[in-house]
């Protein structure tokens, strides 16, 4: 199985320091939906692992998050692709859960879902927490310069991190 795991906000869609709280605020980064569809059509399983503490903070209900993910799935399907397993952490940063990145709980849940190990699997993110979660499970950390990626890069990243401009560049590399 060829598995690619993506963070959501800042990788697939535009991010906001004020959170993505409505379906209208969920706007794909140009090329990201096409990249997921192309990867899927080329035999890649594309899963998503996303921190969504806005739920715990009361900024939006679970139904809104599910609508965003349904929109993502529909947009990718329109281009002939498929989004695999989507996992999210609804907890706030002080709740002590095992799923909120940089903890690796969501990545482990994806591995369990697909019954595979994560050694060498690419986990694409735009933050230090994403890269740390990848390293915690032996996955390959991959940074995109979209979202918070440029700021993350300026602060320094683990030396094994692969760096790409965006998700479309990753698709070109892997296909």
UniProtKB/Swiss-Prot annotation:
Residues the record lists as binding Mg(2+): 7, 9, 126
| Record's keyword annotation contains Repeat | no
User: GO MF annotations for this entry?
Assistant: D-glycero-beta-D-manno-heptose 1,7-bisphosphate 7-phosphatase activity; metal ion binding
Q: Which residues form the active site?
A: 7, 9
Q: Which cofactor does it need?
A: Mg(2+); Zn(2+)
The entry's localization annotation reads: Cytoplasm
Q: Tell me its family.
A: Belongs to the gmhB family.
Task: State the PANTHER family in the record.
Answer: D-GLYCERO-BETA-D-MANNO-HEPTOSE-1,7-BISPHOSPHATE 7-PHOSPHATASE
Protein known as: D-glycero-beta-D-manno-heptose-1,7-bisphosphate 7-phosphatase
Organism of this sequence: Pseudomonas putida (strain ATCC 47054 / DSM 6125 / CFBP 8728 / NCIMB 11950 / KT2440)
Lineage of the native species?
A: Bacteria, Pseudomonadati, Pseudomonadota, Gammaproteobacteria, Pseudomonadales
